[in-house]
Amino acid sequence: MKVLVALSGGVDSSMSAKYLLEAGYSVVGCYMKLHSKPGYHEENIRKVKKVGEFLGIETHILDLEEEFNAKVYEPFVNAYKEGLTPNPCAHCNKNIKFGALWKFAQTLGCDKMATGHYARIEDGLIKVASDLSKDQSYFLANISPEILPYIIFPLGDKFKVDIKAAAAQIPQIAELASQKESSEICFVETTYIDILNKHFNTLMPGVVRDVSGKVVGKHDGYMRYTIGKRKGFSVDGAHSPHYVLKIDAAKNEIVVGLKDELSSFSFTTTNFNNFTDKNELECFVKIRYRSTPIPCLVSKLDDGATVKLKDNAGGVASGQLAVFYDEFDRVLASGFIR
């Protein structure tokens, strides 16, 4: 069976290719060039070619910059303009890594594709990785259900510390074991504000209101804030921390309140991505990557869903991905918070 492995030049994808070879698969590697961040690709491509030579596999460089720009980068920028808090990795996984790359894999005659993500597939569903500290099931929950039968996650049942230790024992790829892990959005050089400043004037002072509509302070520009943020704005006479509750992009205003005013017991989603055949789900939801799962009831509604929480959630942010899990840590569905 022929498998295409997405190679990044990092230890996880490189070891994934090695494990697949050892399991008897015919492996081909591919590095995706997604953006023009200065100095980003040259070193990665060198490492990918070195890994390919060591493993004896064919490697390809696939330029997907135009598609990435249209499907990930531009929506990211425009989301902030609309006062939303985007999740570019969720869009990238759906449209690029498990979209455009899979199409390329098929042109090479591949039967399946693999990545170095920490996640598992169980009974046709994405499942949380064994290494909970590295689990990436949340970011994978927006991919098309139709592609799941064609995906392999070689690291799903492994632990990062063991992967790095194993790589460190292999002279040809030992350098990958000690390199710094990437944790930021790949195309962001410093902060997301630096990206937005290339397209907009984000420094636009405006007013801060409380939940009653009263003007209580000033802010530096609505794009500089996300739901739940507690710094960077003034609140006259405040003795307790205040948090951003709402962003009004059209008026360049933010609404703030005390921590208990952040709480929500319900929300709705768009782009409901259902991995089951059920229109109602009693499950658990994560409203952010590292948030604690909350018991909930989900009801499909047109292309979205309504979500009723059994416990309150703080900081439900429009544009973020809500991911729904069953009691066995498997992804049942996802949707973008409205």
Curated annotation (Swiss-Prot):
The keyword Disulfide bond applies. Keywords: ATP-binding, Cytoplasm, Disulfide bond, Nucleotide-binding, RNA-binding, Transferase, tRNA processing, tRNA-binding. The record marks H117, Q320 as: Interaction with tRNA. Residues 134-136, 288-289 are annotated as: Interaction with tRNA. It is found in: Cytoplasm. InterPro entries: MnmA-like, MnmA-like_C, MnmA-like_central, MnmA-like_central_sf, Rossmann-like_a/b/a_fold. Disulfide bonds join C92-C186. It catalyses: S-sulfanyl-L-cysteinyl-[protein] + uridine(34) in tRNA + AH2 + ATP = 2-thiouridine(34) in tRNA + L-cysteinyl-[protein] + A + AMP + diphosphate + H(+). GO terms for biological process: tRNA wobble position uridine thiolation. Its EC number is 2.8.1.13. GO terms for molecular function: ATP binding; tRNA binding; tRNA-uridine 2-sulfurtransferase activity. One of its GO terms (cellular component) is cytoplasm. The active site is at C92, C186. ATP binds at A6, L7, S8, G9, G10, V11, D12, S13, M32, G116. It is an enzyme of class 2 (transferase). It comes from the Bacteria. Pfam families: tRNA_Me_trans (PF03054), tRNA_Me_trans_C (PF20258), tRNA_Me_trans_M (PF20259). Catalyzes the 2-thiolation of uridine at the wobble position (U34) of tRNA, leading to the formation of s(2)U34. Belongs to the MnmA/TRMU family. This is tRNA-specific 2-thiouridylase MnmA. It comes from Campylobacter fetus subsp. fetus (strain 82-40).
